[in-house]
Amino acid sequence: FQKTAQQYDLDWHFLAAIGYQESYLKPDSVSPTGVRGIMMLTNNTAKAMGVSNRTDPAQSIQGGAKYFDQMLSRYSHIRNPDRNWFALVAYNMGPGAVDGIQKRLRAQGKNPNDWMTMYNFLQHNQASNGRYKQAVQYVTRIRSYLEHIKTSPKLLEI
């Protein structure tokens, strides 16, 4: 994680937390939806990121880092730390879903680039869309893992 994070100028803790949330760091993980590997890449995302073997740990981490970096760039107009949370939702749901939610928020006269506004939308609409509930849990868990990773000296060798 550390080596790959350096290539993209990313915080390696984020990559490790994403990998843990996605697969518990198990390279052979496969979801019923077809995503696989440590970073649980879809086949299309893997191809777009240059990954030929999603269950190869190095390729999966490389592909996940590249994709997360693209999501961060996509939301570069949003200030940190909010940009991180938007990028995580996009990593989880896809950027098209985030764009659609932002469009709805804008139409409601709300700030579509504010994390709490996005979070509240996802939270209040999760009964109508299971992906919203999943996105809330995804970001919440990764934020928790980030704190744990940053405060656990034993994890510094990931």
Question: How should each PLM-predicted stretch be described?
Answer:
Residues 1-158:
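Catalytic glycan-binding domains that act on GlcNAc-containing polysaccharides
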